[in-house]
């Protein structure tokens, strides 16, 4: 069973960090990671993980994980690799407004995660394709907001 758990972890990691458009591409990536499996096994694994296909920014359909799964490996090197792929670019403050810049396509899901945490210090968010505007409660320290956001965006510093 451990072998299957490791394989599922590898699938989540690959899908989270690369644009994979077919089972054949995913099988090749898994082979590079040292996993030998058939297309039928991969198909069952994808079904178990509830993996779907969605259009990427370049119009190519790629595998994506369900919205609520955020996957991170535990080793420093691969965690750093994952942090570079979570979409966060920058955070700036002006008065009681914060602006988060993301890679294209990441803002909406990141705003969704912020809203679902129901931080009392953040009144609400508005998201576009690559920008999130947060309205902050009056008098909240930017350091507190940064600390709260670090629960969702680990590399926010």
Curated annotation (Swiss-Prot):
Cellular compartments annotated: Cytoplasm
Name of the protein: Arginine repressor
Pathway: Amino-acid biosynthesis; L-arginine biosynthesis [regulation]
Keywords: Amino-acid biosynthesis, Arginine biosynthesis, Cytoplasm, DNA-binding, Repressor, Transcription, Transcription regulation
Gene that produces this protein: argR
Entries under Pfam families matching the protein: Arg_repressor, Arg_repressor_C
Family per record: Belongs to the ArgR family.
Native source species: Bacteroides thetaiotaomicron (strain ATCC 29148 / DSM 2079 / JCM 5827 / CCUG 10774 / NCTC 10582 / VPI-5482 / E50)
Single GO biological process annotation from the record: regulation of arginine biosynthetic process
Role of this protein: Regulates arginine biosynthesis genes.
Family matches, as PANTHER family: ARGININE REPRESSOR
GO cellular component: cytoplasm; transcription regulator complex
Single Gene Ontology MF annotation: arginine binding
Domain of life from the UniProt record: Bacteria
